[in-house]
Regions:
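His-enriched metal-coordination microenvironments in redox/metal-binding proteins
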Residues: 1-6, 123-125
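Residues immediately within or flanking Cys/His clusters that coordinate Zn2+
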Residues: 4-6, 58-62, 84-87, 105
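Short cysteine-rich clusters marking metal-coordination/redox-active sites
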Residues: 9-12, 65-68, 90-93, 108-111
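Short recognition patches in nucleic-acid-associated and regulatory proteins
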Residues: 14-59, 73-79, 86-99
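A short local loop/turn or secondary-structure capping micro-motif enriched for an aromatic residue
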Residues: 24-27, 105-108, 124-125
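Beta-strand-rich cores of mature extracytoplasmic or soluble domains
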Residues: 62, 66, 71-74
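Short Cys/His-rich micro-motifs in 6-15 aa windows
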Residues: 71-73, 111-121
């Protein structure tokens, strides 16, 4: 089950909600592929070709889009056998994003003055 996190800037009071983690529907590679654009889907399929049961880790991770100036959730997959990690672009503008660790500090993408606070506000599946 995934979690819903709220990111808040103590300086400018901007806030963002992000659905992080993964749901029960993300257990099979076929359903996870749908979360990525076609070019990344092809890379994932090429990297897992020949594997009967591909081993992978999938999660929606927090990321900062400096173009949109906000926090977004992006799909990230790690393929164990290939040792490859693939991350989708910003879901709003398509730009490359900077994936963040949830326990790390995230500078406010709106004002750039303070680190965001993070609070879990719900669950999703």
């Amino acid at each position: 089950m995934g979690r819903i996190s709220e990111f808040v800037c103590p300086s400018c009071n901007m806030s963002w909600e992000a659905r992080l983690g993964h749901g029960m529907g993300h257990a099979a590679l076929g359903s996870v592929l749908e979360e990525f654009p076609p070019d990344i889907q092809q890379k994932i399929l090429a990297d897992t070709e020949g594997e009967q049961y591909p081993a992978f880790e999938f999660n929606y991770c927090p990321a900062v889009c400096w173009q949109c100036q906000k926090v977004v959730a992006v799909p990230v997959i790690y393929l164990h056998q290939a040792g490859q990690t693939y991350t989708a672009a910003c879901p709003d503008c398509g730009n490359s994003i900077a994936v963040q660790t949830e326990d790390g500090e995230i500078l406010c993408p709106h004002c750039g003055k303070e680190n965001l606070t993070v609070e879990e506000i719900g669950r999703w599946d």
